[in-house]
Amino acid sequence: MDDLEQAILLASDSPAAAAASPAVRAEALAYCARARDETPPSSLLHLCLYGLASSPHAHVHFWCLQTIHDALLLRRRLALPDDLALLRSSLLSLAVSSNAASPPFLRNKLAQLLALLVRFEYPHVYPSYFLDLIPPSPPLPGPTDMFARVLVSLDDDLLSQDYPRNAEEASDAGRVKDAMRAQCVPQIARHWHEAAVSLRAADPAVAAVALDAARRCISWIDVSLVANDVFVPLLFDIALSPGSVAPLAAAAVGCLSAVAAKRMDARAKVALLRSLMSAQKGFGSPDSGLKMAHLVTAYAVEALECYRKLGSSDADGAAALEMLEEVLPAVFAAAESGDDDEVDSGSVLEFLSGYVSTMKAPTEKQLGHLGQILEVVRMQMSYDPVYRGHLDVLDKIGKEEEDLMAEQRKDLIALFRSICRVAPGATQLFIRGLLVTALSSAEVSVEDVEVALTLFYRLGEIVGEEEIRTGAGLIRELVPMLLSARFSCHTHRLVALVYLDTISRYIKFMQENDQYVPHLLTVFLDERGIHHQNAHVSCHAGYLLMRAIRLLKAKLVPYLDTILQSLQDALVQFTATDWANKDIKFSSSEDGSQIFEAVGLLIGIEEVSPDKQVQCLTALLNPLCQQIESLVMDAKAQGLEESSPRAIGLQQIIVALTMISKGFNERLVMGSRPTLGVMFKKTLDVVLQVLISFPNVKPLRSKIISFLHRMVEILGISVLPCIPIALRQLLVDNEAKDMSEFLYLINQIICKFKSSANALLEDVFPAIASHLSVILSHDAFSNGFASNTEEMRELQELEKRFYAFLLHIATHDLSTVLLTPSCRHYLENIMQLLLITSCSHKEISHRKTCVQTFVNLIKDWCSSSEIEDKLPGFRVFMIEKFATGCCLQSVLDKSFNFRDGISIALFGEIMMAQKVMYERFGENFVVNFVTKLREAHCPPDLAEQYYQKLQGNDIKAFKSFYESLVMKIRQQQNGSLVFR
């Protein structure tokens, strides 16, 4: 044992181990492991018991107890009865003689081992465990502490229902509880009371452990053993006494809470709650809430549940509601205390939500309670002032706090909404009080203003648009109050952002009440909005102004000059800022460019006179175009790097031009106000010079593509002559992402201009096909990258847009382009790609697109007479390859899922393809397809029925029949046909 003892000390965190080398410690660990694993069970037990009796070292005692515990847990079936009896008597002797001064980790391990023996042996092998362990009266600290730890370990490892248990554990737990209830629970309860009385002053820590053990057992013992005239007053006295140390007071509160939460019939629960209420004068007072937060919350939850079950018409139900309302002041005090250690805010919030949900038409008393609940919501939604600076600059700490608060507020907002629905008037009065307080004090905090505005914003989510528009309730008073508000802390980012959002939430009120439009514009244009010192606030204000202009439109025409004058410096700053050196990161939807969209929308309002539009647009476009020309000239002389200030400056200007154009449409620009069209056409020419000069600067090219999208939309057919030169430049040095953007533009042009784009498409198609044959080669997918890489995602997106490109060609009278001499060279590869994809691509949506493309090509290229076909051989290809591979074999494959929505849509397109092939190809298609059906083991009668259904006009019946035919063939083949 001496060698083992030395090894244990070296392997532990003892002083001897600290002085040992790593090699020596490793050797000691290995020695201990061999002793534990290779010693026979009986010998190991005797060795450990000897160590417990003879060694003076706590680390050795712990190793021995842990080793016995593990061996017993793993080999208990092999343990001899005599060994177990020896172990039992030794451990009970240690427990009974336990000294409270011994290390807690050692007492916990001894308790855990005794709890395991209880599980295995009580009561059938040894029925006296608890009778032996219950300390005699008067209880001493050592044995009392040890007994409590045994009960706690037993609860943790077996009895508690807070943890998942397997069937064997559940059976053992039931057996132990039943035996304890029959044998010793009353004696144990008396011991808890005696320990609390005698040790609360002498050794409060041990008294607290004893009461914690009691709390754990209350859920399954006879509650009257604790809920009586002797024990309950004692617990209240301990909980509320100024002389009670915090752990002891908390343990007493825990016991009372467990009593309140005890499961029982609702009427019995009402009687129990009544007894608790009567046992302590002032139980529902705010002071009780501060000192017994867990208890008053549990009490309120149980009273509410009784009220729900019994109803207000029942005497006990009414009594439950009365007791609930009596304890509410204590609940509110607990909730408002902000003490996270004492108050479970989740439980309080759940109770308050349940309480509000019981209200239909609140009484005056209940309205008062709702006001207090709103105050709880306000307090719990408020930020901690310690994070004020972090939230203003939004550093890492501030971002984490903002995210945490957003999550924390979800349930609070749900509760706020419930109150709004039950008592809208009271809610509006509450918010009015918050706003008045915030506006009347120069010392009001950032946190108080932010939460007041947030609640007003959330109110706007709940009330209907009609109520906002008409200013129902107090909205007619609150919105003007808000419009004129200038809070002392308005410079703070949080306050400024929520202020602007709240103004925007109620903008329908300004739409109906024109007199407030100037106030609204002032908010957006002064230092509260676009001219705020914080760049994030300024950009957000620009975005919200753009939305306001979209809504108010003609109402803003009288203020056009005022708005443009106020925005002049912001417009200049956007294109002049050195964004390359800015650390600020903006979301793509709020990067500051929205002020250009706002101005474009404003100028583009039809109520603005033509001359005024020309004047304003000239003042906007000319300086931007001049900036572009100057930057291009400098860049040609000195070069243009992708991340250089010049390149980024050009990007910003082109973004600004794109955003301005969003305020205009083709009808206005090319119809009623053609002068505007000329101006945008000149701007396009300037932008194209950038593309011609620097086609390889990818970020710049991406911004130019976005601008081209807008020009296609507003200039209409007149833009076509400018497009070829742009497209040729956009095909320079392309990768997957670049080609994807390019195809998106081409697809827009095809959909917009249809057959008018014939010549353009004929010109660029060979280059497109050539580029894509390389980028979308088989090697790119099979040998390139893992399927989850960014490169692979870009390839997949390009593939999707290419199939859409072919479909747009086929559906917009442009399929003859594919038959021209310059494009025909690529036709065979395209047909094979469409065939393979339609039959077997893993993306069902791609297969559907390809089938639709084939259907449209059949309609375009084939007639009922083969002589008139535009592409010789296409008919045979469709009958022999497509019809067989896609319409039959691909759906016979067991991977084709008839329960999947996208697959069902594909199946519908396949059925349509068969109808079109029959319409254009006639008997040639039918004969070949029926032959293939028979080769696939289709019964002859079903093949004949197929022909009949194909000839009919009911496509739904045809589809249903063909699905059943496919399933029957699958069954006959037993899934043997797998098409790839």
Curated annotation (Swiss-Prot):
InterPro entries: ARM-like, ARM-type_fold, Exportin-1/Importin-b-like, Exportin-T_C, XPOT. Expressed in roots, stems, leaves, flowers and embryos. It is found in: Nucleus; Cytoplasm. PANTHER family: EXPORTIN-T (PTHR15952:SF11), EXPORTIN-T/LOS1 (PTHR15952). GO terms for molecular function: nuclear export signal receptor activity; small GTPase binding; tRNA binding. GO terms for biological process: flower development; meristem initiation; tRNA processing; tRNA re-export from nucleus. It comes from the Eukaryota. The keyword RNA-binding applies. Probable tRNA nucleus export receptor which regulates tRNA processing and facilitates tRNA translocation across the nuclear pore complex. Is required for correct leaf initiation at different developmental stages and may play a role in floral patterning. Disruption phenotype: Reduced size in non-mature plants, delayed panicle heading, reduced seed number and low seed fertility. Keywords: Cytoplasm, Nucleus, Receptor, RNA-binding, Transport, tRNA processing, tRNA-binding. The keyword tRNA processing applies. Belongs to the exportin family. One of its GO terms (cellular component) is nuclear pore. This is Exportin-T.
